[in-house]
Amino acid sequence: MRLSEILTVALVTGATAYNLPNNLKQIYDKHKGKCSKVLAKGFTNGDASQGKSFSYCGDIPGAIFISSSKGYTNMDIDCDGANNSAGKCANDPSGQGETAFKSDVKKFGISDLDANIHPYVVFGNEDHSPKFKPQSHGMQPLSVMAVVCNGQLHYGIWGDTNGGVSTGEASISLADLCFPNEHLDGNHGHDPNDVLFIGFTSKDAVPGATAKWKAKNAKEFEDSIKSIGDKLVAGLKA
């Protein structure tokens, strides 16, 4: 399904999000299923039947995204961090009590990210081979990320890393923003490989104290990082 068709579906279902700018529409269609500048390869999307065909790609100047011959990647659910068994995370079989950047986020007056409130992306892979460390390519923890999902644009932050070799994972709050009608929870994610996660290598991607870390819901937090996200996305070239 091309992005124009996905956009039509999104409008019919009444899903709400930020407008997808033309340059990002072009990027989505141009890079789908392709990567010439592979930064690291041999990863999965959490589904062993689809093989280790997922990679981190540097084809977009100033950005890193997850690519595969199947398109992009899926969106599994992450519930790590504060309140990791609350709400729709109650049935998460693999939730952990802290995120990779717990010590970094404490400076903003919260104990850790809350998957039910903070729309974060799991990006980068540690502990197992292959590994990928986004910091080695300029990304910084808790930086703004752009997510194209369900034909729409959303913003989140880089909030956790994966200890294994899988990709395509985001907090339950981000998943609900992207796919409000799919009834996702800690044990049920979005399976199609049509989600584009974009991390930025610019220092300008770090919101710091300007983000509403003490937000009451995901939309409030997302709105607080929108101005940064808009500037970063506007600078992307297909």
From Swiss-Prot:
Keywords noted in UniProt: Allergen, Carbohydrate metabolism, Glycoprotein, Glycosidase, Hydrolase, Polysaccharide degradation, Secreted, Signal
Location in or out of the cell: Secreted
Notes on temperature effects: Optimum temperature is between 65 and 70 degrees Celsius.
EC class: hydrolase
Residues with attached carbohydrate: 83
A Pfam family: Glyco_hydro_75
Primary site of residence: secreted
pH dependence: Optimum pH is 6.5.
One GO molecular-function entry: chitosanase activity
S-S pairs: none
Induction record: Expressed during human infection.
Name of the protein in question: Endo-chitosanase
GO BP: any one term: polysaccharide catabolic process
Signal sequence region: 1-17
Annotated catalysed reactions: Endohydrolysis of beta-(1->4)-linkages between D-glucosamine residues in a partly acetylated chitosan
InterPro entries registered for this protein in UniProt: Chitosanase_fungal
Documented effect of changing residue 38 to I: In strain: NCPF7367
Function (record text): Chitosanase catalyzing the endo-type cleavage of chitosan, the deacylated form of chitin. Chitosanase may be crucial in the degradation of the deacetylated portion of chitin in the fungal cell wall. Chitoolisaccharides produced by the hydrolysis of partially N-acetylated chitosan are known to have many biological activities, including antibacterial activity, immune-enhancing effects, and elicitor activity. The chitosans with higher degrees of deacetylation were shown to be the better substrates.
Entry EC no(s): 3.2.1.132
